[in-house]
Amino acid sequence: MAKVAILGAGNVALTLAGDLARRLGQVSSIWAPISNRNSFNSVRSLGSLELVGPDYGGDFQPQLEDDLETAISGAAFIFLTVPTMGQQGILCELANFNLSSSVLVALPGSATSLACKQTLTPAFAPIAVIEATTSPYACRRVNAQVLMLSVKRTFEVASTQALSEEVRGGFEILFPNRLQWYQNPASIFFSNTNPVAHPAGILAAKDTIEQGISPIPKFYRKFVPQAITRVTAIDEERLTIVNALGLESETDFAYCKKWYGGHASNAREFYETFEGYADIETPRNMNHRYLSEDVKHILVLWVEIAEVIGVQVPEMKSVVQEASDVLNEDLSHTGRGLSSLNLEGSNANAIVRALNGV
């Protein structure tokens, strides 16, 4: 079976490693950047881990590599599993190596194809970059247990290049899910729905968090449903951008139903009742990735692209402003925008091409 290298040592990385080990008998190489090795070092100290899943599980021992070159050497698939704000640093390190025999996979993607185009040496670029809308699982690690809380029925991916049947088949077998192939990575960028629910939910929880109320209600049980009107408004604005650009996507609720199933008839009911989200804690601090990543690195760019194509996004703008106030930082200037991506002055077609890694 083709070698898999996993960059990052967080929840998704370890669940993917455990899934491959227990379902396919495959040991994956795991590497993490020196600047962010808390989880990596913790796993090393534990030795072996236990995958706990709804249908299968068991012990596995990740192959931890201190050296990036060793980790990716001979890998057919290199998985980038770090948050959006950590991807660029790793891509800069990958630029030192020949990736022309590998496929780079962003799990999930967030304009990763564009970042690769701007960062990696063309002659040594990967066969293709594949971006995913989401991770294959709802998951988290608790000490030595890697909890695969729920396996998504399907999730969406897109590639910068047409893949051979051999490469595509080798990729699809790595997952317990059925994959839905979108036409291009630009659609994936606008279908990463983290900025739809996360920022609205944590902003709804602001007073509770800042007052230090304990026990604090669960994030998806209490605060996302409390903000559901705002969540829905952001989602509608997102889809208006998608339609204006001629891309493909679905509503946040449609994705939730497609990924997880269940009997919920609307978004509020889903968030209030889905067991896979039931125990997810509310952040204890407002300086959290729900704002510092989902707003700063994704939503800001959505807003700027909307302005280019003449789409009104008042709810998105209000979230950017509130997040800026909370973080004491003008995210419309410090966030990832068109100018920081060398796309200032670009028209809609040029922006879509860039997001597709062209």
Curated annotation (Swiss-Prot):
UniProt xrefs under InterPro entries: 6-PGluconate_DH-like_C_sf, 6PGD_dom2, NAD(P)-bd_dom_sf, Opine/Lysopine_DH, Opine_DH
Cross-referenced Pfam families: Octopine_DH (PF02317)
GO molecular function: D-lysopine dehydrogenase activity; D-octopine dehydrogenase activity
Enzyme class: oxidoreductase
Keywords linked to the UniProt accession: Crown gall tumor, NAD, NADP, Oxidoreductase, Plasmid
EC number(s) reported in the record: 1.5.1.16, 1.5.1.11
Similarity comment: Belongs to the lysopine/nopaline/octopine/opine/vitopine dehydrogenases family.
Quaternary data: Monomer.
Protein name: Protein ocs
The encoding gene: ocs
